[in-house]
Amino acid sequence: MSIMTGFVIIMAEQIGLLWKRLHAVPFGVYGATQVGKTTLHHQLRTRGEVPKIKERTVGRSRATRKTIKIDGDQHTIRTSDIGGETLYWGEWLKDMKTRKVKYIVFMIDDRHMDKHYDIEQQLCWTFLVDTICSPYWDAINRRQKKKSHDYPVAVGIWANKFDLWKDKYEYEDIQNHPIFESFKDGMQKLNDKGIPCYKYVVSAKSDSEMVYRGIATMIEDY
């Protein structure tokens, strides 16, 4: 290898690193109320143990940049904290559209397994999947047709609070954990649309490495 070739390779690597620092990848983080979305945002912003969140998120906050570093690699992302109550679901759609979200993290916990009558998360998931798969931004009136780049690159379904429920249920492989069972129809619908789904477990409050690795995996593998 000549000196010039080596120099070009080094410069290309440095430009790539600079691009990762300056270019913020738009992530959308959605899910039911009190599932841990705000906690995840705190963990992305300040690495370490996240204090208890006392106030619920109201509406949609301004998107902010977060930089993650893991295994010597670095990525900059941009996320917005949005409430999970039914009246804020429309804000999820606005967030996807206005920020041109490329990756989506849908957060769940084990409430649907702990209390089988609690279907809040399944309803959230159905709304989100239908919104993503619809060829229109305004699905009701069939207006504002989406373009190919309006669909997310991948959707992650993250089972949060793993530290609290990891020993409560029997499973052999985390990818086949029963916590994901209630969401498989939506995952299949997304796959049929050509949008891959990434199943992941995380403890957003206490394990920053799990959070950072999950984000990095979505960016690098999809």
Where are the regions a protein language model picked out?
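Short acidic, S/G/P-rich loop/turn micro-motifs used as interaction or catalytic elements
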Residues: 35-36, 85-87, 110-115, 162-166, ...
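Glycine-rich phosphate-binding P-loop
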Residues: 26-49
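Inter-motif core of Ras-like GTPase G domains
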Residues: 89-135
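Switch I (effector-binding) loop of TRAFAC-class P-loop GTPase G-domains
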Residues: 45-78, 84-89
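Well-ordered, non-membrane alpha-helical segments in soluble/globular domains
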Residues: 118-143, 172-186
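Short, flexible boundary segments at extreme N-termini or domain junctions of P-loop NTPases and their
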Residues: 1-32, 140-141
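Conserved beta-strand/loop subsegment of P-loop NTPase cores
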Residues: 103-106, 136-161, 191-201
